[in-house]
Amino acid sequence: LRGNQVHQGSKMLKSSFLVIQVMFRRWKRRKMQLQVKAAVTLQRAFREWHLRKRAKEEKSAIVIQSWYRMHKQLQKYAYVRACVVIIQKRFRCFQAQKLYKRRKESILTIQKYYRAYLKGKIERTNYLQKRAAAIQLQAAFRRLKAHRLRRQIRAACVIQSYWRMRQDRVRFLNHRKIIIKLQAHVRKHQQLQKYKKMKKAAVVIQTRFQAYIFARKVLASYQKTRSAVILLQSAYRGMQARKMYIQIPTSVIKIQPYYRAYVSKKEFLSLKNATIKLQSIVKMKQTRKQYLHLRATAVFIQQHYRSKKLAAQKREEYMQMRESCIKLQAFVRGYLVRKQMRLQRKAVISLQSYYRMRKARQCYLKMYKVVIIIQNYYHSYKAQVNQRKNFLQVKKAATCLQAAYRGYKVRQLIKQQSIAAVKIQSAFRGYSKRVRYQSVLQSIIKIQRWYRAYKTLSDIRTHFLKTKAAVISLQSAYRGWKVRKQIRREHQAAMKIQSAFRMAKAQKQFRLFKTAALVIQQHLRAWSTGRKQHMQYIELRHPVLMLQSMWKGKTLRRRLQRQHKCAVIIQSYYRMHVQQKKWKTMKKAALLIQKYYRAYSIGREQHHLYLETKAAVVTLQSAYRGMKVRKRIKDCKKAAVTIQSKYRAYKTKKKYAAYRSSAIIIQRWYRGIKITNHQYKEYHSLKKTVIKIQAVYRGIRIRRHIQHMHRAATFIKAMFKMHQSRIRYHTMRKAAIVIQVRYRAYYQGKMQRENYLKILRAVNVLQANFRGVRLRRTLRNLQIAATVIQSNYRRYREQTYFNKLKKITKTVQQRYRAVKERNILFQRYNKLRHSVIYIQAVFRGMKARRHLKTMHLAATLIQRRFRTLMMRRRFLSLKKTAIWIQRKYRAHLCTKHHLQFLLLQNAAIKIQSSYRRWMIRKRMREMHRAATFIQATFRMHRVHRRYQALKQASAMIQQQYQANRAAKLQRQHYLRQRHSAVILQAAFRGMKTRRHLKSMHSSAVRIQSRFRSLLVRRRFISLKKAAIFIQRKYRATICAKHKLHQFLKLRKAAITIQSSYRRLMVKKKLQEVHRAAVLIQATFRMHRTYLTFQTWKHASILIQQHYRTYRASKLQRENYTKQWRSAVIIQAAYRGMKARQLLREKHKAAVIIQSTYRMYRQYCLYQNLQWATKIIQEKYRANKKKHKALQHNELKKAETCVQASFQDMNIKKLIQEQHQTSIIIQKHCKAFKIKKHYLHLREPVVSIQRRYRKLTAVHTQAVICIQSYYRGFKVRRDIQNMHLAATRIQSFYRMHRAKVDYQTKKTAIVVIQNYYRLYVRVKTERRNFLAVQKSVRTIQAAFRGMKVRQKLKNVSQEKIAAIVNRSALYCYGSKAQCEAVGSEGVIIQEWYKASCFACSQEAEYRSQSRAAVTIQKAFRRMITRKLDTRKCAALRIQFFLQMAVYRRRRANFVQQKRAAVTLQHYFRMWQTRKQFLLYRKAAVVLQNHYRAFLSGKHQRQVYLQIRSSVIIIQARIKGFIQKRKFQ
């Protein structure tokens, strides 16, 4: 009846909960719709207000910009003009100084060469004389040096012998000293060891002797005390024996009835308990066998089915990924080949252009040299022919012609340079704008990607928290028909398994109820028979125990009343607790059942609908998916619009701040300009007149300076001619004097020579003989010494050469061997590493399998042998800790090599490990549940036995209550198991689907990212090709070679990246299929580290090369800008405006391209999801509201386009005004052009242009190098961020795992503490009981002593003394014993007198003794009852605590699971947010740097244009003035 009532109540609760949930969901849906509508209206209002505000701000900014530009241009004009005046002054001064220096240098060189000739002649004579003297001195010095060397060698030999002897002696003395010291230390150590041994022996002897003396003393004292103790013991034992003799008959009479009742009761209860125990064990074993068989079959079916499904699914995924990888590889290789062909063609074209340029340059140089030579000859001829009179007129005419010619030449040059500069500027601006657009586009795409990821995460999280069924349905609707098909199959299989399992459970429950009914019937029959026997026994005993039962009945009734009241209170509280618990569990179960029932009912309805109307469902799904895709596109657009609006707001705010500061500055300057505006015309006229006067004055000053220089040159020539003639005269005179002196000396010398020769011949004969003898001797000695020296020197040279060769060969051999050994060791290490990793993987798999087997065996052993549970649990905990430590250590080793691994692989490994851990925890939880269930049943059985043994009267009630309670517990346990099984199945299915969807999503994201990067790369390459096509005419052979080298390196890097990517994909698939992740990860890490090292090395070399080329080009550029500062024209500003206008148009076109690209990307996704292609158009036509929204967006875009066109129109007006002013200036300038000089000066201008193009090409190359370096830096930074994120995830995961371990340990400690506290409590209660028992015994002893005293009262004192003396003498034979007994007898007499004194109060004492007896009996019964109640309460509390701990563990597990899920969600949100912020910061920084660079560059270009235009105007005006003067 109670089960039916509970079932009806649960049904009512289910229905009420269903109604409440439906109403709550409707209310929540309505609330969400209202919130969405309100948000949409607010967004529209905010955007309209923002657009209006932006239009106003742009108008104000345009006005401020126009004023600010005008002010900046005026300021720059004044500065440029001052600089031009200074440059002209310095240039003219430099020209005059140059002419003067040339002439002075020519004069000085002539003087220098002549003086050098004279000095050389004199020095030659001196040199010959000195040479002869030096030869003689050298011969003498060498002789003396050889003699000294011989002596030194002999002395060195003697010194070396003495030194070696001394060294040997010193070594010998040192060795002797060391040996003596060592011998001394060894002897000292030996003596110390001997001394320590002797000291130890002495100490041992002393301690033994002292111990012997102390033992003798202790033995003597011990014998004395022993004799005294023996006397006391004998006296006490005699007294105790007398007491026992009196107590035994009384206690025997009392114990006999109690013992007989106890024995009969015990036999009856033992038989009853044995029968109950046997029945319960037999039934438990039967049910256990059935349950295990059903469980094994269900697990085997589930595992087989899941493995089969997983294998099929993995095979399909692997084939898809393989096909996509093959397609990508083919596409990339074809693209690389095409790119190489294009680059080779470009290199050939650049070589041809360089060769033609070189040929033209050689022709131009030849012509230029010829022209210069002709001009020089012509000027010299004119200077010679013309007279001094016509010199001034000719000079004036020449200066006028030169000025006009130079002005024309400069104008032509500037014009061509301006055209080239305009082209280069337009190309560079286009390139810079394209780069900027690409960076902005990439940043927008990244922001959109991250925002979409965040949006999808938040949507998934909200849907998941609402209802699991809704999440599953939405995921299945979103992610494809394959997942739904798989889920349906799994659902059908699960339904079958659940139905089979529920059938088995229902049968099991029916059998349990049946056995419980039989047990209750047996208990009732046994109780009725026992009751009858007990009544008969009571009727027989009734007349004997009437008197006792009267008092006992009275006390028992009181006690029963109290116990009944207490029991009523306890039962009420207990029922309240049970009902509350039931209600809570029923509520939770009802909620869960409602959830799962709804999920089941929805799934069933969907299944029926699917079977009935498949085509309709497909159409609805496709329509829904199309709607979802469009909705997502719309959301993405909205998100992009919001991001763009925020970014533009930030940009406009920043611009507004800058404009405001510039507006304040402009206002200040504008007030000054307004004041000086009316004086501007007067100042302009004055300026023109001043410039004219300055030009005339400078011309006059230069002409005067040239005249002065001409005069000085003529004077220097005359002086030089005079000096030359004077030098010639002096030389002739000196030569004549020298000839006279030499002739006279020659004649006198001839006479003396003849006399001298006669004497000399005789002396020579004598000297020759003497010298011959001496020379022969010295030659012999020298020859001997030379041979010795040569042999020694050759020996030394050969020895040094041999030593060098030996060292080199040794080093080469060592290095070669080291390299060889290194290679061998590396190969061995790789082999060992691979084998070790493979063995580790196999060993880990074996360990895991072994662990699972041991766990299964442990579960069976726990069920069979409960006594070994604790030891087994300890063993398993130790084993688990060892495995955990091993995993930690292996994880630590893996993390060292896993620093640069991808985040997705980390996530996959983490999911696998968490799944394995979850499976192990699940098994342990099931084991723990089984163990707790066994413990609970065993404790319940034990409590039942004790309770029946203590009290028979309440046996029937307790049996019924326990049977009811057991049924409820089994029902609850069944419901819990069913609930947990359903939860686990649902969690497993959800986990499986999530894992599959995650893998699909990750693979799709990877393919998309690779494809997007490929598309971006293609677009970038196309733009780069356009830039290269524009720049290819300006490049030289060095640039082409450099580009080829760079291309080869880039191709190598691309090939390595592709190969690494292919290896990664293949390894990942093998990891998923074969589960050999450890081996693949290790090889991939090694390969990737090597690749990264190679790429970094190549990148560093490239960066260094680029940086060096950039530095060289920068230096060339600086030299070039110094030489060609006047190469920019006013037209550059206009063309720059034109280029900006074109860039705006290109930007619009890029926006259209971006939209088309997005459309194309969505179309690709649409093609990939083929099932959604048929019904998008139908739903698109039907969904007119969305079309209206899109039309509204298009109108908004049109409004923005109109505003932009209006702004462009204003800008065009300003440009047209500037263009008109430039055209007027050009008209005035073009009047002075001459066509003949244009053809003559065309070739040098072309060469200048080519040089300029080379420099610009170098500059663009440096910019490309910087961009590539920055991209590499960006990639490295992304890798570092990914690595940091991976380390943070790992640390978080380790923290979570440590936390889980800590919580499990904490719960185990709490359980142990509870057990220990119960044990302490039982111990204290036992102690209290023993203390009470002791006190009762003391009271009994006192009462018995009083009884003895009453008996001894009638005997005379003399008889008592005689009896005492006789007994004492009989017991103790010696006098000493008699004295001791006498003292004890005195004590007994005193005690007896005290007892006699107490007999006077006999009446009071009797009443007190009776009361004491009754109190004792009542107290004993009360203690026994209290102990029984306490034991029962303790057992109940223990049971309830165990259940509460179990519930708490389950609640903690659920909470931990929820907390883990929330933590993962928050961590992912934090990670995505952080990465988004990092990317946003990087994008903002890049944009700021790029804007600053563009603004500086633009200002520099404007400044150079204005400066060049001012210089040109001044030069042309001067040329015009000179021409007018000349005419």
Swiss-Prot record:
Residues in IQ domain copies: 35-66, 175-206, 225-254, 248-277, 321-350, 344-375, 394-423, 417-446, 467-496, 490-521, 563-594, 613-642, 636-667, 686-717, 709-740, 759-790, 832-863, 855-886, 904-935, 927-958, 977-1006, 1000-1031, 1050-1081, 1123-1154, 1259-1288, 1282-1313, 1332-1361, 1408-1439, 1456-1487, 1506-1527
- Output the Gene Ontology terms for molecular function: calmodulin binding
- The keyword Nucleus appears for this protein: yes
Q: What are the recorded Gene Ontology BP terms?
A: cell division
Question: What keywords tag this UniProt record?
Answer: Calmodulin-binding, Cell cycle, Cell division, Cytoplasm, Cytoskeleton, Mitosis, Nucleus, Repeat
Name any GO cellular component annotation: spindle
Annotated localization:
Cytoplasm; Cytoplasm, Cytoskeleton, Spindle; Nucleus
Matching entries from InterPro entries are given as:
CellDiv_DevSignal_Domain, IQ_motif_EF-hand-BS, P-loop_NTPase
Main location, first listed in the record? cytoplasm
**Function per UniProt:** Probable role in mitotic spindle regulation and coordination of mitotic processes. May have a preferential role in regulating neurogenesis.
Please report the name of this protein according to its UniProt entry.
Abnormal spindle-like microcephaly-associated protein homolog
Which species? Answer: Saguinus labiatus (Red-chested mustached tamarin)
Taxonomic lineage from the root: Eukaryota, Metazoa, Chordata, Craniata, Vertebrata
